[in-house]
Amino acid sequence: MKKNIILNLIGLRCPEPIMIIRKTIRNMKDNEKILILSDDPATKRDIPNFCYFMEHKLLKNEIKVKPYRYLLKKGL
């Protein structure tokens, strides 16, 4: 059964958000989705790069207003 996760990282600053995202995704199955909420400006750069290098798919990012929202899918 697929589960979708919401990860609230508001108030955390680099490098904590990426470390928590990586640990969370490691415990997920392929094709599961995770919604990430963050107010750290560094995530606008870090999360797309993380997805690229770790081969996950960034389905959506909303970064015009805080909290920023990112929807990721594990795997490609």
UniProtKB/Swiss-Prot annotation:
Q: Which GO terms describe its biological process?
A: tRNA wobble position uridine thiolation
Give the record's pathway. Answer: tRNA modification
Q: Where in the cell is it found?
A: Cytoplasm
The record ties this protein, via Pfam families, to: TusA
Q: Chief localization class? A: cytoplasm
Query: Is the keyword tRNA processing assigned to this protein?
Result: yes
What domain of life does the UniProt record list for this protein's source? Answer: Bacteria
Q: Which SUPFAM superfamilies match?
A: SirA-like
Gene Ontology CC terms? cytoplasm
Any one GO MF term held by the record is: sulfur carrier activity
Q: Which UniProt keywords apply?
A: Cytoplasm, tRNA processing
Entry annotation: catalytic residues: 14
> InterPro entries, per this entry?
Sulphur_carrier_TusA, TusA-like, TusA-like_sf
Q: Which family does it belong to?
A: Belongs to the sulfur carrier protein TusA family.
Task: Spell out the PANTHER family in the cross-references.
Answer: SULFUR CARRIER PROTEIN TUSA, SULFUR CARRIER PROTEIN YEDF-RELATED
Its function, per the record, reads: Sulfur carrier protein involved in sulfur trafficking in the cell. Part of a sulfur-relay system required for 2-thiolation during synthesis of 2-thiouridine of the modified wobble base 5-methylaminomethyl-2-thiouridine (mnm(5)s(2)U) in tRNA. Interacts with IscS and stimulates its cysteine desulfurase activity. Accepts an activated sulfur from IscS, which is then transferred to TusD, and thus determines the direction of sulfur flow from IscS to 2-thiouridine formation. Also appears to be involved in sulfur transfer for the biosynthesis of molybdopterin.
Q: How does it assemble?
A: Interacts with IscS.
What this protein is called in its record is: Sulfur carrier protein TusA
